[in-house]
Amino acid sequence: MDSNEKLIKIIKKYRDAFQKKIEERKLEMECDNNEHYVIYNALGITDTEGYQIDLQQNVGRFLYKYAGSLLEELTISCFQSAFSDAKAKVKLANTIDKSPQNIEIDCLVENKAYEIKWKDATTDGDHVKKEHKRVQIIKDAGYIPVRLMFFEPNREQAIRIQSSLKKII
């Protein structure tokens, strides 16, 4: 199987899993208790609109998860095609504190530890602290951390956070 065929196979795998997850959630939602629609109604949202909002909120969560996982696997596959020594999902022990016990490098190529993000709009302070710790663990292990982000965030606060994360690498 050539590289293009391999990438297409990965895409199909994620597409099928994503579509299956949506269908499963639709079935689950048929049994949902929709008492919370009373609040939607109070805010001018009909039951039909409420269902669509709840469904799209679920689809959106799945979309972000599967989009990130898809792009990560495609990227790792490309690295492994280009670099015979590329290793995926390398775990390092947390040498700073007890939580988490390990951190994971998405793809390790020689001494470069790639973290692959399709889009990262996280804006909380806890995220920044975890990222500082992760980068320090990687550096302490003798690797160079590289953050590979395919799409930059759009919101001002997220842009500021991402800018601060770029400075620690």
Predicted regions span which residues?
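Interdomain/boundary linker segments immediately adjacent to catalytic/signaling cores
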Residues: 1-83
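Contiguous, function-dense segments enriched for cysteine-driven chemistry
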Residues: 1-3, 112, 147
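Short, well-structured alpha-helical interface segments that form or flank functional binding sites
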Residues: 66, 70, 74, 102, ...
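Conserved catalytic cores of phosphodiester-cleaving nucleases, focusing on short active-site segments
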Residues: 79, 105-118
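Secondary-structure boundary elements
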Residues: 80-86, 140-142
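Residue-level marker of positions within ordered structural domains that often coincide
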Residues: 84, 112, 136
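Active-site metal-binding core of divalent-cation-utilizing nuclease and nuclease-like domains
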Residues: 88-108
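Catalytic cores of nucleic-acid endonucleases
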Residues: 118-168
